[in-house]
């Protein structure tokens, strides 16, 4: 069910001026009018220019298929971009001049955007990525030494950080959609925690990951110490935390941190295709699979069997299952979605 608070707008961007909203457009028209911008020397680059650089629509000469009917979601800030393409909600951390570091503008926008795309029936998969040559460098270290305007007790600070973590990485981990972290480059600190909270991770060859916390004298946050041992085992997770070593994309695949590695030159297209395959699958069944797998880590076999039985009966009664059976009988691929 789509949130009433979601605002879908198309805008014209004029460098140096404010974006001008367009509230209607002719269906099927190839639009070059999209919202937001890319920080370059602390100025904004038009979203369409960013899109052409990072998510190019292939021409007939390339021989590949890409949708041109993308829908832009207004995140409320140029530091976070979001569009829906082929049922994939692509959320882009957009502070390349700071390696997409988290901050007081970007992070709240990310929390809110996750809620919007989760409630949008046109979204079958959520992919989080970063502008430029990084995924996310974690918290903005340049602002960590700033003194707070109002003194707070230790307990108040703990409660605040706990809430921030729960509304970001816990929300991401429990999201009703399948999530993919697409790493064009470095994922460090809390940025790595965000990637680990996703169901799947794909990386460019040049990408690397690092816990990084020891380098700034911090113990870690946003759930990395919970996610990492479940992916690679406790001993290896401890080593990565204690040493903050850089793990290349190829090493990350061997460890089980990353699912796929794509060439740098075609990374964004390959990541989009990877997410699109998931997004166009049976969303209800995939969501139930996610719950089965996540809960199975922390419950006994008996409880998992009961959960699987309930979800199998529910999915068996769904339109998705009926379409799959019909498609099998008609010897054609199933079509689970016709909304985009």
Positions of PLM-derived features:
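Terminal peptide-recognition signature
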Residues: 91, 95, 110, 128, ...
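Glycine- (often His-adjacent) and acidic-residue-rich active-site loop
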Residues: 130-171, 187, 217, 300
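Low-acidity, Ser/Thr- and Arg-rich intrinsically disordered low-complexity segments
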Residues: 2-9, 14, 19, 24
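Conserved CoA-thioester-binding segment of acyl-CoA-metabolizing enzymes
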Residues: 30-32, 56-59, 66-131, 170, ...
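Crotonase-fold acyl-CoA enzyme core
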Residues: 104, 170-286, 313-326, 330-332, ...
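C-terminal alpha-helix plus adjacent terminal tail
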Residues: 41, 49-50, 55, 63-89, ...
């Amino acid at each position: 069910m789509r949130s009433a608070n979601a605002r879908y707008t198309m805008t014209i961007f004029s460098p140096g001026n404010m974006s001008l909203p367009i509230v209607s457009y002719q269906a099927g028209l190839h639009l070059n009018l999209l919202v937001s911008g890319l920080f370059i020397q602390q100025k904004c680059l038009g979203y369409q220019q960013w899109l052409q650089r990072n998510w190019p629509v292939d021409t007939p000469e390339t021989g590949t298929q890409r949708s041109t009917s993308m829908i832009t979601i207004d995140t409320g800030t140029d530091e976070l971009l979001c569009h829906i393409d082929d049922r994939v909600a692509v959320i882009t951390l957009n502070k390349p001049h700071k390696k997409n570091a988290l901050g007081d503008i970007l992070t709240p926008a990310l929390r809110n955007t996750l809620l919007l795309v989760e409630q949008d029936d046109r979204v079958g998969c959520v992919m989080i990525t970063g502008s430029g040559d990084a995924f996310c460098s974690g918290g903005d270290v340049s602002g960590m030494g700033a003194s707070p305007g109002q003194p707070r007790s230790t307990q108040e600070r703990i409660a605040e950080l706990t809430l921030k973590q729960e509304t970001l990485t816990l929300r991401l981990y429990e999201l009703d959609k399948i999530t993919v972290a697409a790493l064009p480059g470095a994922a460090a600190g809390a940025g790595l925690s965000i990637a680990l909270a996703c169901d799947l991770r794909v990386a460019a060859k040049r990408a690397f990951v690092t816990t990084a916390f020891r380098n700034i004298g911090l113990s870690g946050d946003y759930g990395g110490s919970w996610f990492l041992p479940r992916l690679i085992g406790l001993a290896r997770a401890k080593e990565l935390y204690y040493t903050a070593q850089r793990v290349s994309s190829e090493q990350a695949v061997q460890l089980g941190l990353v699912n796929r590695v794509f060439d740098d030159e075609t990374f964004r297209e390959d990541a989009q295709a990877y997410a699109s395959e998931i997004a166009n699958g049976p969303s209800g069944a995939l969501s139930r699979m996610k719950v089965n797998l996540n809960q199975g880590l922390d419950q006994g076999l008996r409880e998992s069997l009961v959960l699987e039985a309930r979800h199998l009966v529910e999915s068996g009664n769904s339109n998705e299952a009926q379409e799959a059976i019909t498609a099998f009988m008609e010897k054609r691929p199933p079509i689970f979605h016709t909304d985009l």
